[in-house]
């Protein structure tokens, strides 16, 4: 039996931090970028706005966890091919309950009605420009996800331009020959 710095015993050599997923869901509504938030129904940060998310079960992948938590907390039912894994947040103090690593996902969806469920007291679309003070490090997740989605959209536009010009311009050896 190994013992950690905080006195907990483990049946393996190293302590295991908790793993969570969070998902930043964007939608465009009336010319404004919106972010899907939930109001926390439990401590820590009870009553504070946060991203949909939660703890990873032992029998699911990180993507499955993000999709499950999103559906449980907002009613929004996305498919695996609609989400992107954006970044892993590992700050030592990101969760007051203990060492927690969060895998952040993101999606851009059509705007639709949502409702709070499970441990989320409410779910609501909020303008990205008017984000309230968020629980945990969720503001950083929103900013990182927005940068990521902008990059994806620029790459998509570039690929469409290359395809429209034909495959010749994709191979520099063929240019001018």
Regions found by a protein language model. Name each.
Residues 2-50, 63, 78:
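N-terminal strand-loop-strand
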Residues 5, 142, 169:
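Alpha-helical and His/Cys-centered functional microenvironments
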Residues 6, 30, 97, 115-116, ...:
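Feature targets compositionally biased, intrinsically disordered low-complexity regions
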Residues 26, 141-142, 164, 175:
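A generic signature of intrinsically disordered, low-complexity regions enriched in glycine/proline
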Residues 32-76, 161-177:
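Conserved Nudix-box catalytic region and its N-terminal flanking loop in Nudix hydrolases
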Residues 56-152:
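Unchanged
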Residues 153-159:
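Charged phosphate-binding loop/patch that engages nucleotide di/tri-phosphates or the phosphate backbone
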